[in-house]
Amino acid sequence: SIAPSGREYDFAIQGNAFNSSSGGSNEPGIVWVMQDINGNGQPDDEWYELKGSETGIDGTIQDYEVTYYRPAPRAHTPWVDSEGNSGSVDMNAYHGQEYYYPNWIKEDSYTLYGTRLTPRNNQDPVTGYWANNAYEWGYVDNMGSDNLVGGNVIDGSGQRNGFKIANAIYHDGTPVKLQYIDFIKVQCGVLSKSGWLGEISTEVFSFEDLSITNNQ
């Protein structure tokens, strides 16, 4: 378990975000935490979102749903969402597998639920380069104010964000007072793609209890 420490951050999550003169690469992931109330060691209690800079503002959608459908081999993966939008996760040259649809899902469609942020990606009309721009704070794989010391400024390796258990909220945005947390999950916070770079997809490499490592 990780308990609130009273320090700046309680735990850290490693991504690979970086900033550059053209905007860099930021693929924000929303963090959810759970306390094992029933003590059975399973993530079957209530999940609570950690608030970030986009919580409660115009453009952020709670209770968001997106359904993906199994494609033909080497085909784009189609989706529809709860806002009436549709699109696809496109095959690209960087990933050569036959399917981008998860191998462990036997059904021909599956639905994800969570919170969606407004995308901040854009293409430079002169150079053609795509930029995935950063959010202020509160997200994994993102060069916000909660970015911790370390990380390669060229490719983002070793980049980490710090998080506070005290930022857990109920659905209506009011704070949750958790004694400790036992489970953490990360959901990609944006449904968008940046041209030839492909879809915006949060990368997660490790989780770190800062009360043990003191690596802030």
Model-derived segments and spans:
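Extracellular structured ligand-interaction cores
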Residues: 8-10, 26-30, 45-47, 178-183, ...
